[in-house]
């Protein structure tokens, strides 16, 4: 058994996540950074097949971030793989890019799934990973994976992705309840498209344009409020210390504030929320 990095990450997640940006985000010249030499030891690979983005991250044996690749693609809808061959080809592309950067082949990976997804669909995720050339030996519920990074003891982790909102309630460091509902960033785009007359693809671009987000906030606020309502419904009377929002949708300004207003529970968004879950998926693969 090797050292599990998330124990350190959970104690100081912001410090650990500050290093993630260096290996996942592109350099100003548009080229992703490569390693000076191939890493030694086993690698931990996490694959997150999202409704909006597919993300692949690579960690070393101790859990240090080495490389990450991501791309927008609608190969999954509400947690279900709807374009198998598209998902496989996309993952192969991300895998090839990561392999070139680290100088080693990726032969195995862990992947995640939204809570409540039918078992057959969970297996479909495994099939995508293996068709892309990696053995998939571990699957983990996405909000549980996120807490591998966050290390929350008593609270709620909410993974607001493109199509679904996944919830994990933690007590004494253990997940005691999980749930998933079909609300996420895609619904932001649908609302924006309906209000502006834009196509869905145009609304997606507008949603992610920083200079436009303040003006779009009144349109998407009801969706944010729905996320808060979903959380309250699944808490079922429990009183967690905090709510932590992860997933790409959590990047939209005002998300944490609206959820806190609806729930009355302190709510935060950590650094790089889109990468929390795939990093946790990789960290979950601790049988290297």
Language-model features: locations:
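Nucleotide/phosphate-binding catalytic cleft detector across ATP-hydrolyzing
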Residues: 1-51, 55-160, 174-288
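Short glycine-rich anion-binding loops that position phosphate/pyrophosphate groups of nucleotides
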Residues: 163
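A structural feature that tracks compact, well-ordered secondary-structure segments
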Residues: 166-168
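A cytosolic small-molecule/anion-sensing beta-strand core signal
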Residues: 171
């Amino acid at each position: 058994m090797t050292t599990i990095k998330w124990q350190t990450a959970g104690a100081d997640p912001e410090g650990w996540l500050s290093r993630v940006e260096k290996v996942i985000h592109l350099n100003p010249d548009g080229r992703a950074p490569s390693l000076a030499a191939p890493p030694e030891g086993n690698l931990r690979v996490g694959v997150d097949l999202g409704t909006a983005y597919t993300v692949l991250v690579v960690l070393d044996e101790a859990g240090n971030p080495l490389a990450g690749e991501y791309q927008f693609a609608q190969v999954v809808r509400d947690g279900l793989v709807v374009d198998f061959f598209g998902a496989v080809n996309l993952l192969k592309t991300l895998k090839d890019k990561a392999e070139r950067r680290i100088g080693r082949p990726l032969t195995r990976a862990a992947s995640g799934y939204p809570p409540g997804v039918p078992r057959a669909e969970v297996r479909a995720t495994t099939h995508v990973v293996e068709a892309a050339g990696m053995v998939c030996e571990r699957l983990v519920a996405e909000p549980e994976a996120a807490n591998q990074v966050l290390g929350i003891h008593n609270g709620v982790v909410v993974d607001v992705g493109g199509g679904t909102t996944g919830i994990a309630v933690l007590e004494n460091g253990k997940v005691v309840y999980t749930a998933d509902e079909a609300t996420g960033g895609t619904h932001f785009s649908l609302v924006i498209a309906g209000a502006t007359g834009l196509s869905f693809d145009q609304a997606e671009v507008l949603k992610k344009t920083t200079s436009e987000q303040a003006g779009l906030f009144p349109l998407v606020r009801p969706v944010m409020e729905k996320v808060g309502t979903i959380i309250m419904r699944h808490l079922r009377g429990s009183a967690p210390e905090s709510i932590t929002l992860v997933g790409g949708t959590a990047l939209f300004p005002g998300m944490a504030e609206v959820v806190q207003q609806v729930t009355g529970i302190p709510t935060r968004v950590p650094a790089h929320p889109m990468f929390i879950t795939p990093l946790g998926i990789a960290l979950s693969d601790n049988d290297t």
